[in-house]
């Protein structure tokens, strides 16, 4: 379901905090159930938390918009909250799209030229901020729904077509990039 000409209303700060609380509670339930960690579907494919990260989607003028640190804040606060409640030995991993492959909203790009979403350079800076917040590993990915053929490549695309992008991120952080 996609209505390209309609924009969603901006989520309120109270709603952001409620989302963070729910994610932290879910992580605590997982820990209580015997899990060793949690993977946050947080920073790829154009989902809610990914939209906070991308300036093309995030037009906020508060503490969750503008500069990169502000745009990452919704996730770093969540990660810090999970470690506070579950302990530092409870692993937190995050999926991170290292390149969006879009030229505009609703316009994918096969080549990645004229990137309007996330660039690998920005992904590196995001990865550094996530590592600093306590993320234990990054699950690297590329593409969003507008460039689905990168996120779930068809058989004619070369195997490992984005490995060089993942390697660029790995070179800049001290946590595993998977």
What are the residue ranges of the model-derived segments?
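Flavin-dependent oxidoreductase catalytic cores
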Residues: 1-178
């Amino acid at each position: 379901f996609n209505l390209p000409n309609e924009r969603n209303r901006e989520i309120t700060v109270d709603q952001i905090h409620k989302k963070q609380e729910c994610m932290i509670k879910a992580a605590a339930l997982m820990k209580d159930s015997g899990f060793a960690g949690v993977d946050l579907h947080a920073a790829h494919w154009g989902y809610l938390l990914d939209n906070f990260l991308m300036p093309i989607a995030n037009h906020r003028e508060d503490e969750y918009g503008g500069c990169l640190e502000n745009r990452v804040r919704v996730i770093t606060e969540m990660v810090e909250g999970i470690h506070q409640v579950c302990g530092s030995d409870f692993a937190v991993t995050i999926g991170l799209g290292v390149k969006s492959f879009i030229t505009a909203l609703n316009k994918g790009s096969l080549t990645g030229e004229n990137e309007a979403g996330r660039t690998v350079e920005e992904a590196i800076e995001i990865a550094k901020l996530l590592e600093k917040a306590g993320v234990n590993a990054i699950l690297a990915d590329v593409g969003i729904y507008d460039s689905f053929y990168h996120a779930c490549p068809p058989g004619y695309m070369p195997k490992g077509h984005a490995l060089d992008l993942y390697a660029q991120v790995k070179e800049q952080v001290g946590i595993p990039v998977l």
